[in-house]
Amino acid sequence: MTDALTDEALHALKGNNAELFGAVYQTFAGQVLGYLTAKGVPDPEAITQDVFLAVLPRLDDISGGVHGLRTFIFSVAHARMVDEHRKQSRAPEYHEFDPERDTREVSSAEAEAMVLLAPKEVMNLLDYLGDDQREVLTLRIVAGLTVEQVAEIMGKSDGAVKQLQRRALITLREHSAVKEYVSP
């Protein structure tokens, strides 16, 4: 691969920072972008710009011609890539849960029970429970709310809701009408 920038051109452009930077950027930006992309940097374009912003003030101080310049540019690019990966490992990117992107193939026990039982059977099973237990299971399983949401609705703590749900499920497991649906 031939460089568009030669040692002679680099020497001739010393002192004219605008043209020198333009030539350096045109010569190396694509290579730096490719390097950062290959290394898995999440936003390689932004990091490429950061690399050249770090290189610009040091252009007059670089020795070794085009080879020394290339070494310096890729040293900066490597350091920025390492910094970016460290930053990502310390503060991972969070995404909201999107049910359409959920690729799990195993459904939950609650979902399987709902498929097996007709709505009237579910209501009959819930009659075995106390009012609070029935309300918790209805909100958690039928309405699909989180523990925190159920606690807020019922005016109880998260722990109380979890305990009510646990006791309700134990009560249901002990009834013969439920035993045919529940595997040991």
Named regions from a protein language model:
Residues 13-14, 28, 32, 44-55, ...:
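Short, small-hydrophobic-rich alpha-helical interface motif
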Residues 1-30:
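N-terminal module of bacterial RNA polymerase sigma factors
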Residues 38, 60-64, 75-96, 115:
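Arg/Lys-rich amphipathic alpha helix in sigma70-family domain 2
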Residues 2, 83, 91-119:
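Internal acidic/polar
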Residues 136-140:
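A short pre-motif secondary-structure segment
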